[in-house]
Amino acid sequence: MYCVQCEQTIRTPAGNGCSYAQGMCGKSAETSDLQDLLVAALQSLSAWALLARELDIRDRTIDSFAPRAFFATLTNVNFDSARIIGYAREALAMRDSLRTACLAKAPGTQCDHPLADLRLQGEDVATLRRQAAEFALDSDRAEIGDDIHGLRMLSLYGLKGAAAYMEHAHVLGQHSEAIYAQYHHYMAWLGTRPCDMDTLLDNAMGIGKMNFAIMAQLDKGETEAYGDPTPTSVNVRPLAGKCILISGHDLKDLQMLLEQTDGLGINVYTHGEMLPAHGYPELRKYRHLVGNYGSGWQNQQQEFARFPGPILMTSNCIIDPNVGNYSDRIWTRSIVGWPGVRHLEGDDFSQVIAQAQVCDGFPYSEIEHLITVGFGRATLLNAADSVIDLVAQKKLRHVFLLGGCDGSRDERSYYTDFARAIPQDCLIMTLACGKYRFNKLEFGTLEGLPRLLDVGQCNDAYGAIMLAVNLAEKLGCGINDLPLSLILSWFEQKAIVILLTLLALGVKNIYTGPTAPGFLTDNLLAILNQRFGMRAISTVDADLNGILGHA
């Protein structure tokens, strides 16, 4: 195996990347290799989808399947080799159907792509693993060099993150022919193993720009379905009674679970990136959506073990449920998979509900502890004039966007310490699961505004970006001239594509941590610093003084 896509990848003087029997995430070498083969199959599919478009042939089923299957290769999503092979077979079957349609419309049509005629060379896993070696992501690294390899990975992993957001939008009924075409373009291009540095950098920015449109699409889908998020208090302590925990990002799954449990006396708790769901009017109207349980995804083996009911995983992040001995109580949905864990097909949650009814549930209610969520795009934009007034009156010195992915490294305490150190005349916006480092602390208010504003899930960076754009327009300045600084934490591929989106939009001087991506060389980091001012976090005092010294 060779995998370097997440923040916890193995790092050694000889090179970075997980390359042993098992990755740091728990992914087996077998599954990792088969995911490489799946990616190649999806690149073959995209090559034919592009050619089909030239002949005015489009297939919505294929366009939605491709990013969904790609999503299965993200960190902590699908560890089930059998399902990965199934996706690869399905991709090539769809590819062949496109080939047939193209030949029927234009006999003699040929696809000039190195993966156009890719075939799986066997039925058994061992044979497919041997074939997968041809598509290992580092197979030509010695030939092309670490810089080109790193830029390829930047685009590949960024496109993975964009594919995940495409799937989230698709679930909510959002489609865009322009986005599908762009996705297939970048996917097919990556299948050619590009080697030109300028093209690789340009296309990485192109993927970031495309993702901005995807996030807008997802924002539209969520707000049309569930209303604009508004500030809402959420209890983070359990209540007595039967219970179900839902984790991941899929608000549609939460909606269906709430509908199917309504009136049954079962309390539903959100976990991880589901926390922002409480801000949506059409979700919080369900009285049995009673609160949020737990913290960042990396703590789930301890927290899920203590949860006295079933757990539903709707997207990333799942880790080995056997460690906490709750594998009989966890269920997977959609693209999520773990060997031996029960997977739900369709939208019937009756098996999960039945299990909740026989589980013990919480024996008593704990003392309530409320936190506030729901500072979505509309709420932020409505507050823009107040922010401008506070800045003009010199009552608001600076705004910090402090958030991103959480993880297990000790260095992530930086984000807790940074939040605590931010002066009282500054606001803090936060998003994604990195907020769990400090979202239960008390930050008070600034002239009536809460100092801590929970913007939402990772994709809700869109709302923060739109606030920045709106403020810049009203103040007649550029985004980089605002009293705004971004201090981001990363772990996986959604964070990579959000970073690419910010860079593509011209946002500069972003602080990132806790470590640099393992696929980015010192030379590439220097290029990103030179072009965009992107820099690594250092110490809280040094970074805070560096920012406010210029504020």
UniProtKB/Swiss-Prot annotation:
Binds 1 [2Fe-2S] cluster. Keywords: 2Fe-2S, Cytoplasm, Iron, Iron-sulfur, Metal-binding, Oxidoreductase. Hybrid [4Fe-2O-2S] cluster binds at H249, E273, C317, C405, C433, C458, E492, K494. It is found in: Cytoplasm. GO terms for cellular component: cytoplasm. It catalyses: A + NH4(+) + H2O = hydroxylamine + AH2 + H(+). GO terms for molecular function: 2 iron, 2 sulfur cluster binding; hydroxylamine reductase activity; metal ion binding; peroxidase activity. The keyword Metal-binding applies. [2Fe-2S] cluster binds at C3, C6, C18, C25. Its cofactor is [2Fe-2S] cluster; hybrid [4Fe-2O-2S] cluster. Its EC number is 1.7.99.1. The modification Cysteine persulfide is found at C405. Signal peptide: none annotated. GO terms for biological process: response to hydrogen peroxide. Belongs to the HCP family. Catalyzes the reduction of hydroxylamine to form NH(3) and H(2)O. This is Hydroxylamine reductase. It comes from Edwardsiella ictaluri (strain 93-146). The lineage of its organism: Bacteria, Pseudomonadati, Pseudomonadota, Gammaproteobacteria, Enterobacterales.
